Amino acid sequence: MNLKKKKVLVVGAGRSGLAAVKRLKALGARVILTDQKEPDQLSGILELGLPDGQLVLGHIPQWHEVEAEVIVLSPGVSPQLPFIQEGIAQGALVWSEVELALRDHPAFKIGVTGTNGKTTTTTLIGELARRTGKSTLVAGNIGVALSDQVENLDEEGIIVAELSSFQLELVDSLCMNVGILLNVTPDHLDRHGTLENYLAAKARIFEKQRPSDCAILNWDDARVRELAPHLKARVVFFSPTSLLAEGYGVQGDEIVLARDGKITPIIKRRELQLRGNHNLENIMASIAAVRELGLSWEEIAQGLREFKGVEHRQEVVGTYEGILFINDSKGTNPDAAEKALYAFEEPIVLIAGGKNKGLDFHDFMKTVKEQVKSLVLVGSAAAEMEQAAKDTGIRHYLRAETFAEAVELAIAEAEPGNVVLLSPACTSWDMFKSYEERGEFFKELVRRHYREPI
């Protein structure tokens, strides 16, 4: 779709929205930007060079104020807002910023989604893809807006995009050459309402694929596996727990590919730097994706040996006085935090809490009871988590009023040979702007406690 001189409304003036405006201006569109925040609460607006008539700020607008042919939504904006619904009724197209950036780009596109593991998988695929020698862009829901970067990528390049359910629910014509669905567990139910709606949003990563494209699915996740018969693309399965008849699996200590009755060994688990069974999901999906790029087994294995992981995902902060500190601030739901608990054999002091996303903590607390030595709760969800802990029979837990107090309590509970793990099972939005800010503050507090230079 040629956007030159088309009227396009961008909703949300955060990172994605500002990137979308810049991209649209480069494409010759007539842009209107709206955000309910006041101008002094927003940064980067002035640099866009939009006249006042193309800025609608400080309130949720009526459709007649912002009428457009295309609406581009930032990830945090619900398409159910009345003015957006009125626009849809009037025939406006609704896109995500990712759709805007990628829909007409000829590069090879790899999309990664799932409840947990997206960022690690996306980053790992990007690292491996660069071994092809082609220009590679890693972006999406991972800190870099695609619209900011895509014009710098040549037509023969590779795009690896982390895609959230918010971005995927707005798929219009976006087609991924390789689409990956890692797993689906309850998350963002405050936005999607039901698990079925959430799964449907995730599954849209495959909606526009063709028979020549590839869909990579987790065999061990029944909800994901059952999508296979409904997909147009060629399906490749992986299983982090078993040897499949066809697909990527495990045999003893090795990750292998089973195909046409032949077993191909790829790499031994002990050669990997990433800990935890859940990381096998990320690794296997990454292997399957980059095989579509033509990488050899040795090139893949060498890349896997060198990959150390991603900041804020079970990141090693350091060992102080015999205590290992792990920053898993990206563990923003119970399933992610539960996987982190199973990654360590040492006794764990867990810091959990933050802002809940409408999720239940009872099953999570059953795992906490089995795996955790001491539990420290903090944040707006602390009372809810405390009740779930009581209901599960956990008697020893601590409540902190501030995040700094939570870290000090955890250190006091820990002994040499223990792990202090920040894996909150909640978002950061009650105390911090992002999980990154929370993770950085955790690292700062730990280093400050042990008087290490920051």
Swiss-Prot record:
One of its GO terms (cellular component) is cytoplasm. It holds the Pfam family Mur_ligase_C. Keywords: ATP-binding, Cell cycle, Cell division, Cell shape, Cell wall biogenesis/degradation, Cytoplasm, Ligase, Nucleotide-binding, Peptidoglycan synthesis. Pathway: Cell wall biogenesis; peptidoglycan biosynthesis. It is an enzyme of class 6 (ligase). Disulfide bonds: none annotated. SUPFAM superfamilies: MurCD N-terminal domain, MurD-like peptide ligases, catalytic domain, MurD-like peptide ligases, peptide-binding domain. Belongs to the MurCDEF family. This is UDP-N-acetylmuramoylalanine--D-glutamate ligase. It comes from Desulfitobacterium hafniense (strain DSM 10664 / DCB-2). The gene is murD.
